């Protein structure tokens, strides 16, 4: 396997700031993590399973968000953490740079059946046909439709779809509300730039991969269609300003107040609605491509072992334990029980492992009379098997910045879609050239 350059000048400059490992004098039984936190029972229960099975290990969970530059600097300095928890969309980049180790021997030692993992999450942790990480949660994107608002416009919520792009402008006009020229209701939020991979895929294009180009006419069309939908709703400045007023995580959210008719959204938001607005009247359906086929992308994090990890064997034990179906079921039960004690609903647990999900949704999940979860959770579970993922790239972070920046320029009226995506492609090519890949 050809390893791409790991250490840039900027990383060398900060490498002396200190690493993230256990320190040379630490006991051999220490295990230091990076990028992982303990926010709820999904984390704490699984960590407890590992601690019980490995009482001799001094597990040090360094809570906090993953910092890419800090991680690469620590690897360059020869002082990395033992195990890292990072966005799996970027793991291919770290593998290409030689910053993480292949897990073939680790997975074989623990008899981990990769066939249990769904294709999309697994593809993101695979580089040159070798697996460099084990994926964890799997968040999807679904359409959440505000039934009263849509019915008020004389439409059937169940029939609302993203299949016919030529019909979307008229749909937006019908659902959007202005008062004295001021936006009062968003008819349809296309969620760009962040959901551009979904719109591009719906048009038959990927944003990364050997044959992908950001200036592909199909990508340009996706940018044009979605940004024009925003323009029809007052333009980006007023659209975003109005959206920023939403009580997204409260009882007076945009579905409860009628400030939004429909949008694609991350599946985790169903839990928010189920908790804060359990009686809100919504329909949850798949996003569809231009042929009418259900379409969604899977995102989440993965565990990996950095190059230079002092305790790769223990790190392997930790990863295998944290991602085992039995451990997931234990965590799901703990999460369900903690939420029940607080008077809150449990919206299921969705992982990259189909065996774990099947058990959780058979043994643990029960929507009760919560309407949001009753219809939303089965939709998400059914979509998991057919999700796609943005292909891994040696320059994943740079590509993300390139296409998001391009869409933002169009939204702000600085460039037209063709010109902006052409610039994004040039930026992507420079980034790929810097890391020596495609």
What annotation goes with each model-predicted range?
Residues 172, 211-244:
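Glycine-centered hinge/linker elements that transmit conformational signals in sensory
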Residues 88-141, 283-285:
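Hinge/lid segment of periplasmic solute-binding proteins
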Residues 63-71, 89, 162-169, 239-253:
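Short helix-initiation/N-cap motifs at beta->coil->alpha
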Residues 374-438:
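Conserved C-terminal helix/tail region of periplasmic/extracytoplasmic solute-binding proteins
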Residues 69-80, 97, 149-150, 169-178, ...:
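Short helices/loops that flank or line small-molecule/ion binding pockets
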Residues 42-46, 221-222, 310-322, 420:
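Short amphipathic alpha-helical coupling segments at ligand-binding clamshell hinges
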Residues 2-93, 110, 245, 326-330, ...:
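Conserved N-terminal structural module of periplasmic/extracytoplasmic solute-binding proteins
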Residues 269-279, 292-297, 305-401:
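C-terminal lobe and pocket-closing loops
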């Amino acid at each position: 396997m050809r390893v791409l350059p790991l250490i840039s000048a900027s990383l060398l400059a900060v490498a002396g700031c200190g690493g993230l490992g256990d320190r040379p004098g630490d006991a051999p039984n220490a295990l230091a993590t990076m990028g992982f936190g303990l926010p709820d029972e999904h984390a704490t229960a699984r960590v407890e399973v590992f601690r019980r099975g490995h009482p001799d290990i001094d597990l040090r969970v360094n809570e906090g968000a993953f910092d890419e530059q800090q991680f690469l600097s620590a690897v360059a300095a020869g002082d990395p953490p033992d195990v890292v928890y990072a966005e799996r969309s970027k793991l291919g980049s770290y593998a290409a740079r030689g910053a993480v180790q292949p897990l073939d021997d680790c997975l074989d030692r623990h008899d981990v059946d990769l066939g249990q993992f769904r294709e999309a999450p697994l593809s993101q942790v695979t580089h040159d046909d070798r697996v460099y990480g084990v994926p964890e949660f799997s968040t999807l994107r679904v359409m959440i439709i505000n039934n009263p608002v849509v019915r008020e416009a004389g439409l059937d919520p169940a029939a609302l779809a993203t299949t016919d792009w030529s019909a979307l402008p008229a749909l937006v006009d019908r659902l959007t509300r202005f008062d004295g020229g001021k936006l009062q209701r968003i008819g349809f939020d296309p969620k760009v730039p962040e959901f551009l991979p979904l719109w591009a895929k719906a048009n038959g294009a990927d944003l990364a991969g050997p044959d992908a180009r950001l200036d592909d006419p199909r990508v340009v069309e996706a940018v044009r269609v979605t940004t024009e939908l925003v323009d029809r709703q007052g333009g980006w400045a007023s659209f975003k300003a109005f959206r920023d007023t939403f009580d997204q995580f409260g009882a007076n959210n945009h579905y409860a107040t009628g400030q939004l008719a429909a949008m694609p959204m991350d599946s985790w938001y169903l839990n928010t609605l189920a908790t804060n607005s359990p009686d809100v009247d919504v329909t949850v359906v798949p996003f569809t491509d231009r042929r009418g086929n259900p379409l969604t992308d899977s995102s989440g994090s993965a565990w990996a072992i950095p190059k230079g990890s002092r305790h790769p064997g223990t790190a392997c034990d930790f990863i295998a334990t944290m991602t085992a179906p039995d451990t997931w079921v234990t965590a799901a039960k703990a999460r369900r029980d903690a939420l029940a004690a607080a008077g809150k609903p449990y919206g299921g647990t969705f992982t990259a492992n189909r065996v774990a999900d099947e058990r959780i949704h058979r043994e643990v999940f029960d929507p009760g009379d919560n309407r949001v979860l009753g219809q939303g959770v089965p939709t998400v579970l059914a979509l998991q098997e057919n999700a796609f993922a943005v292909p891994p790239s040696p320059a994943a972070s740079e590509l993300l910045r390139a296409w998001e920046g391009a869409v933002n320029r169009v939204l702000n009226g600085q460039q037209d879609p063709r010109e902006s995506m052409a610039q994004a492609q040039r930026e992507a090519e420079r980034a790929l050239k810097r890391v020596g890949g495609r």
